[in-house]
Curated annotation (Swiss-Prot):
CDD domains: LysRS_core, LysRS_N. The gene is lysS. Pfam families: tRNA-synt_2 (PF00152), tRNA_anti-codon (PF01336). GO terms for molecular function: ATP binding; lysine-tRNA ligase activity; magnesium ion binding; tRNA binding. Homodimer. InterPro entries: Aa-tRNA-synt_II (IPR004364), aa-tRNA-synth_II (IPR006195), aa-tRNA-synth_II/BPL/LPL (IPR045864), Lys-tRNA-ligase_II (IPR002313), Lys-tRNA-ligase_II_N (IPR044136), Lys-tRNA-synth_II_C (IPR018149), NA-bd_OB-fold (IPR012340), NA-bd_OB_tRNA (IPR004365). Mg(2+) 1 binds at residues 399, 406. This is Lysine--tRNA ligase. Binds 3 Mg(2+) ions per subunit. Its EC number is 6.1.1.6. One of its GO terms (cellular component) is cytosol. Mg(2+) 2 binds at residue 406. Keywords: Aminoacyl-tRNA synthetase, ATP-binding, Cytoplasm, Ligase, Magnesium, Metal-binding, Nucleotide-binding, Protein biosynthesis. It catalyses: tRNA(Lys) + L-lysine + ATP = L-lysyl-tRNA(Lys) + AMP + diphosphate.
Amino acid sequence: MELNELQQQRLAKLERLRAAGIDPYPPRAQRTHTIGEVLAGFDQLMDRGEQVTVAGRIVGARRVLGKLAFAHIEDESGRIQLWLSRGDLGDEWFDRFRDDLDTFDIVEASGTLRRTQRGEPSVFVTRMGVLAKSLNPPPEKWHGLSDIEERHRQRYLDLIVNPEVRDVFRTRATIVRTMRRFLDERGFLEVETPTLQPIYGGASARPFITHHNQLKQDLYLRIAVELYLKRLIVGGFERVYEISKVFRNEGVDRTHNPEFTMMECYQAYADYHDMMRLVEDLYRALALEVTGSTTIVFQGQTIDFGPAWRRVSIPAAIAERTGIDILELTELEPLQEAIRAAGLKVDLKPGWGRQVDELFSVYVQPALIQPTFVLDHPVALSPLAKRRPDQPLLVERFEPVVAGMEIGNAFTELNDPLDQEQRFLEQGRAYDAGDDEAQQMDVDFLNALMYGMPPTGGLGIGIDRTVMLFTDQPSIREVILFPHLRPRE
């Protein structure tokens, strides 16, 4: 590895430490208190004259003023000032601090606690040690790494210099923990299903493909867990859920990452109305846990999860916004003729269902700011959902939308094996016609349905987008620790 000038200077300091018999990467630390513990009990510890040992990374500039020196160190729990005097610390380590230690080094310091004349809590250091010498200097503006792509490529550095980023991922953990507790308390059983699958299904997406050498078989990283969870409903589990990574070989943008986290749950003897109530209760619980209130602010918009969510029908909303009645234009060509005649600026899609989805995505969804259930999806887009009895072109399905962003998907699940077989055959014809996101025939899943699956409601929630909402982040990359990026050129 070729080192630049600043790295070489730091390497020389490391070698001086080693030459003096000091291990710059010792195996153990002597820490007695976190910085947060010291700050929380500062006055009591100070009054007792208790010796503490803290450890952390040197942040900010070090100051050396004759026989005194100052630095701040930071651990995950907080930041505190170190006060070093040549008399208390001794010549050797005072000189080492001055000459051989740098910003970003990880150190430990022992001493008693006092406040400075300005009232700042400080450790008056009597012993010091190096725990990890940093060979990389901080970025130019160490207090804030601002290049967005570099922040995502070097998330470790982003977490060092932008402490607020750590708060995003603490909130993410709170959301996942709260979601688990919410489902557990309602009698759902957490399960695990295969990541490598012989047939991909449960969503309309392109898969990632790998190969099992021993079995001489192509396998797919899962694009959803739906079909396995519904097999469990057939098997007699009445409420199941899984929180897992799923993988879709698709583009990367503000709300999409090829690897993302989903929560899927299924409830026997329920339908999509039950799933709506579950979603309303879940997001109210998340808001209260994260913010203490049912309201949040996302990108300047105040969102209220307290009231019942609005219901919006796709055909009615498209008619209101564009003047096109999709239920009167149930073939692709007449629908696209109407789009052209109306001068609507949307991409022309292969398939009536996809064209309806495009109209809704462009002309309706961006305006849905408050929590909304989007209902009445075309059956062509929903091969796993039960048809509406009164309108066979549509299904019992909803997508929860908040701040113009789809955050999930839910159905009354299709449990008729004969209807499901016909849907799979239609998907196969679409695939043969060039739709590479069409779903595949899954004979084993059909066999499971033939044993009988009770009426079932199913729900999938995008955890990454949910975290975006509750942390007010504009991009999915900000809520994934290590998002996928293009290779460096």
